[in-house]
């Protein structure tokens, strides 16, 4: 799948070097299929790296995707130059009248704070509420998933005994769900978090299904039955080196982190980590784009605002595109 982004985005060169199809404006104008319009709320501190990770996963199907990035104006980002945000990101006030086929809300390293203590919490609440009427399918990652569950259903989060960090084998609980078409019974899934959404409170939300779980991680992927809301408690988007970087960062900050589980060969952090989840990540995001987004939205983009009220789309009946 080609992704179309603003020309000059630093991630473009890295993506092309990795054989990822990135499309410029001129070529995009000659496409005959309707592109999907996706919004990425990037809450991660290393924004350029997260951009590349997300775009890589969006690029692997035959569809064209127009990707826009959103940042929180109520937060001072120390690791990203304002010029980069001005050039390649939009604020909520700039996009709130628009409609999107899909939304991705990333994680953020703020999970040890209460939700209301996060300085951009009010702004994020507005975006989550806005998405109900302006986005067809929303995918939330790690803290972004915990935040959305709290905002929408009042599901609180709780501290884990220690940081859950490493690569864990997760079981596919709903193999017939479209998001898991083509999956094996288990897949490797990066985790990096101190908290979890309260499992007993999740069970009380009748519209949510547990799609994946493991003994070590608990619930790992949830979704509404109509796939309009999807919650990933781990980081399928992570690169091979991301957990290693976080481990070194935590050591430098004096946090005395445990070694990420099932990650470094022979449990030696001097060894290069093995990538064991990339194919599952690519397949999951492709399934999301195809079955939850593309198959559910109308061919004519201007009809999306009317279509958003349809809550019971049958994924066995494809719309004509």
Swiss-Prot record:
Keywords noted in UniProt: Acyltransferase, Amino-acid biosynthesis, Cytoplasm, Methionine biosynthesis, Transferase
Its biological purpose: Transfers an acetyl group from acetyl-CoA to L-homoserine, forming acetyl-L-homoserine.
Pathway given in the UniProt record: Amino-acid biosynthesis; L-methionine biosynthesis via de novo pathway; O-acetyl-L-homoserine from L-homoserine: step 1/1
Subcellular location field: Cytoplasm
EC number: 2.3.1.31
Protein name: Homoserine O-acetyltransferase
Site (Important for substrate specificity): 192
GO process annotations (BP): L-methionine biosynthetic process from homoserine via O-succinyl-L-homoserine and cystathionine
Catalytic residues as annotated in Swiss-Prot or TrEMBL: 142 (acyl-thioester intermediate), 235 (proton acceptor), 237
Lineage start: Bacteria, Bacillati, Bacillota, Bacilli, Lactobacillales
